């Protein structure tokens, strides 16, 4: 925040201590009350247009406001009229309030922009069918885009190089709660052998759009691919089991030299009593 802004607001709040008596003379005043000052900066197109607004609130009711577009304090209720008139008579307060557009808003924008509006995170793109794909059978193809920032993103579907628009559905950007977004764009399809579906993602964090393809295959090709994956995983499991057995077996042997010949001699591990 600008160096002069905090003392200025504090001074106004201290000045508001007279509010309890001036606003409630001749009325039943509450024993407890709350006075608040809330400052907001509104930016349009970066810092091209900046608006600084301070709201003064008494017991949840806004009664005086300073708006940099107006350039003065405005009473929003009858009870706020005395304070607005007094503060508008203070030329130093008016000038400091008007300067807050640069001293507070633009200053804080420059400090926060690198990790807020300037922050960019590239998306991860995955394409998969909703159900096991079969030729000539209606299905839904998902393009899942996750972990991107900012939330503005363009996702398109193509079939054999031609953009598909009529059968496209989207969840829209969903906030993850960690300053990233996710979305799923779905395409209704009836795959034919040789069809190539492409999800094209364009985002400000990318130097060029990212495309992920999904190709329609015959049932035989699909089952063959699944069988290949299963065989690979099974072979990997057997390999790991073999390595573990070999490592355990080697723990019970040492290698020594006898008469120039290398032999292996079993070594019994000590047993506890």
Curated annotation (Swiss-Prot):
<feature type="region of interest" description="Beta-1">
    <location>
        <begin position="27"/>
        <end position="120"/>
    </location>
</feature>
<dbReference type="GO" id="GO:0042605">
    <property type="term" value="F:peptide antigen binding"/>
</dbReference>
<keyword id="KW-1133">Transmembrane helix</keyword>
<dbReference type="GO" id="GO:0050870">
    <property type="term" value="P:positive regulation of T cell activation"/>
</dbReference>
<keyword id="KW-0967">Endosome</keyword>
<dbReference type="InterPro" id="IPR036179">
    <property type="entry name" value="Ig-like_dom_sf"/>
</dbReference>
<keyword id="KW-0491">MHC II</keyword>
<dbReference type="InterPro" id="IPR000353">
    <property type="entry name" value="MHC_II_b_N"/>
</dbReference>
<dbReference type="InterPro" id="IPR003006">
    <property type="entry name" value="Ig/MHC_CS"/>
</dbReference>
<comment type="function">
    <text>Important modulator in the HLA class II restricted antigen presentation pathway by interaction with the HLA-DM molecule in B-cells. Modifies peptide exchange activity of HLA-DM.</text>
</comment>
<feature type="disulfide bond">
    <location>
        <begin position="143"/>
        <end position="199"/>
    </location>
</feature>
<feature type="topological domain" description="Extracellular">
    <location>
        <begin position="27"/>
        <end position="224"/>
    </location>
</feature>
<keyword id="KW-0812">Transmembrane</keyword>
<dbReference type="Pfam" id="PF07654">
    <property type="entry name" value="C1-set"/>
</dbReference>
<feature type="domain" description="Ig-like C1-type">
    <location>
        <begin position="123"/>
        <end position="213"/>
    </location>
</feature>
<comment type="similarity">
    <text>Belongs to the MHC class II family.</text>
</comment>
<keyword id="KW-1015">Disulfide bond</keyword>
<keyword id="KW-0732">Signal</keyword>
<dbReference type="GO" id="GO:0050778">
    <property type="term" value="P:positive regulation of immune response"/>
</dbReference>
<keyword id="KW-0325">Glycoprotein</keyword>
<dbReference type="GO" id="GO:0002250">
    <property type="term" value="P:adaptive immune response"/>
</dbReference>
<dbReference type="GO" id="GO:0002503">
    <property type="term" value="P:peptide antigen assembly with MHC class II protein complex"/>
</dbReference>
<feature type="signal peptide">
    <location>
        <begin position="1"/>
        <end position="26"/>
    </location>
</feature>
<dbReference type="InterPro" id="IPR050160">
    <property type="entry name" value="MHC/Immunoglobulin"/>
</dbReference>
<dbReference type="GO" id="GO:0019886">
    <property type="term" value="P:antigen processing and presentation of exogenous peptide antigen via MHC class II"/>
</dbReference>
<dbReference type="InterPro" id="IPR011162">
    <property type="entry name" value="MHC_I/II-like_Ag-recog"/>
</dbReference>
<keyword id="KW-0458">Lysosome</keyword>
<dbReference type="GO" id="GO:0031902">
    <property type="term" value="C:late endosome membrane"/>
</dbReference>
<dbReference type="InterPro" id="IPR003597">
    <property type="entry name" value="Ig_C1-set"/>
</dbReference>
<keyword id="KW-1064">Adaptive immunity</keyword>
<feature type="disulfide bond">
    <location>
        <begin position="41"/>
        <end position="105"/>
    </location>
</feature>
<dbReference type="InterPro" id="IPR013783">
    <property type="entry name" value="Ig-like_fold"/>
</dbReference>
<dbReference type="GO" id="GO:0042613">
    <property type="term" value="C:MHC class II protein complex"/>
</dbReference>
<feature type="glycosylation site" description="N-linked (GlcNAc...) asparagine">
    <location>
        <position position="45"/>
    </location>
</feature>
<protein>
    <recommendedName>
        <fullName>Patr class II histocompatibility antigen, DO beta chain</fullName>
    </recommendedName>
</protein>
<feature type="transmembrane region" description="Helical">
    <location>
        <begin position="225"/>
        <end position="245"/>
    </location>
</feature>
<comment type="subunit">
    <text>Heterodimer of an alpha chain (DOA) and a beta chain (DOB). Forms a heterotetrameric complex with an HLA-DM molecule during intracellular transport in endosomal/lysosomal compartments in B-cells.</text>
</comment>
<feature type="topological domain" description="Cytoplasmic">
    <location>
        <begin position="246"/>
        <end position="273"/>
    </location>
</feature>
<dbReference type="Pfam" id="PF00969">
    <property type="entry name" value="MHC_II_beta"/>
</dbReference>
<dbReference type="InterPro" id="IPR007110">
    <property type="entry name" value="Ig-like_dom"/>
</dbReference>
<keyword id="KW-0391">Immunity</keyword>
<feature type="region of interest" description="Connecting peptide">
    <location>
        <begin position="215"/>
        <end position="224"/>
    </location>
</feature>
């Amino acid at each position: 925040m600008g160096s002069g802004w905090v003392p200025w607001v504090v001074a106004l709040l201290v000045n508001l201590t007279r509010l309890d008596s001036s606003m409630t003379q001749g009325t039943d005043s509450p024993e407890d009350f709350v006075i608040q000052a809330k400052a907001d900066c509104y930016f349009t197109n970066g810092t091209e247009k900046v608006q600084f607004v301070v709201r003064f609130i008494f017991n949840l009711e806004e009664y005086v406001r300073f708006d940099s577009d107006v350039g003065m304090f405005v009473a929003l209720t009858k009870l706020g009229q005395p304070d607005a008139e007094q503060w508008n008579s203070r030329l130093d307060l008016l000038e400091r309030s008007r300067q807050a557009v640069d001293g507070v808003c633009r200053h804080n924008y420059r400090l926060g922009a690198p990790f807020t509006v300037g922050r960019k995170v590239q998306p991860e793109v995955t394409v998969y069918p909703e159900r096991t794909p079969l030729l000539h059978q209606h299905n839904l193809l998902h393009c899942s885009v996750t972990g991107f920032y900012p939330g503005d993103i363009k996702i398109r579907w193509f079939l054999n190089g031609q953009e598909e628009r009529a059968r496209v559905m989207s969840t829209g950007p969903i906030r993850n709660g960690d300053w990233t977004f996710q979305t799923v764009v779905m395409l209704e399809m009836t795959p034919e052998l040789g069809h190539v579906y492409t999800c094209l993602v364009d985002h400000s964090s990318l130097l060029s759009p990212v495309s992920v393809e999904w190709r329609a295959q015959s049932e035989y090709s699909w089952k063959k691919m699944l069988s290949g994956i299963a065989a690979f995983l099974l072979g990997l499991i057997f390999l790991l089991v073999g390595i573990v057995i070999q490592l355990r077996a080697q723990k019970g042997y040492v290698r020594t030299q006898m008469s120039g010949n290398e032999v292996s001699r079993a070594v019994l591990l000590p047993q506890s009593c």
